[in-house]
Amino acid sequence: LAVKTHVKGDFPKDLVALHNFKGGYCGVSKVENDIINLCYITNFEAFKKFKNIDEFQEKVVFKNKYLNSIFKNSQPVFETPLTIGQISFSSKSPIENHMIMCGDTAGMIHPLCGNGMSMAIRSAQMASQLIINYLQGKIESRIELEKAYQKSWNKEFKTRLKVGHFAANIFSKNQLSEMLVPIIKQIPNLLPKIIKLTHGKPMVVKCAC
């Protein structure tokens, strides 16, 4: 289950915060018009004990003192939060019934990695270039096109998804994350390396002008 809402309140414009709670995590950032974007994700096991979102927030999310302070000291912009259920981070195939999958349809990375949109753009770029090569006769058959895309997709994204899934599992487990955060603080180079594994290399676009 993912829940998103916009609120007005006091929060730095140059900060993106990530806070966890039992069974999930919440991202906080300033967006346009001085609005604070609050978005959290949790699993069904953590949520099913409660009647509604309000009760879940009061009894679970607000156990995190930082989230409690942000929610309680802000004014909602939305009448009701936006929600979406049945989100799947399970493995998918870049090719389905001979159709090329791009973005989340090929594999959805956890939101805490903050890299879903760039993955969608990058996979579309990869698919476009291979399709152009196919239409120009540089790739001889549709089967070769599919194999080339699958190989390129796995090389570009498979590790990112695995690392993102691993990081999300750790972050949604309070005791484990509380134990690991001090360790990460003691090893300054560790966090940038983890982030790099979920983001890959910068995308290069060739100008045809």
Please report, for each region that a protein language model flagged, where it lies by residue:
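Glycine-rich, flexible loop/turn motifs
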Residues: V3, P12-A17, L67, T80-G85, ...
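C-terminal helical "tail/cap" subdomain of flavin- and related membrane-associated enzymes
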Residues: I132-C209
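Short capping/connector residues at structural and topological boundaries
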Residues: P12, G23-C26, K30, I36, ...
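FAD/FMN-dependent oxidoreductases across multiple families
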Residues: K48-I131, Q136-I139
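Generic recognition of cysteine residues
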Residues: C26, C39, C102, C113, ...
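Conserved FAD-binding catalytic core of PHBH/FMO-like flavoproteins
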Residues: L1-F62, Y66
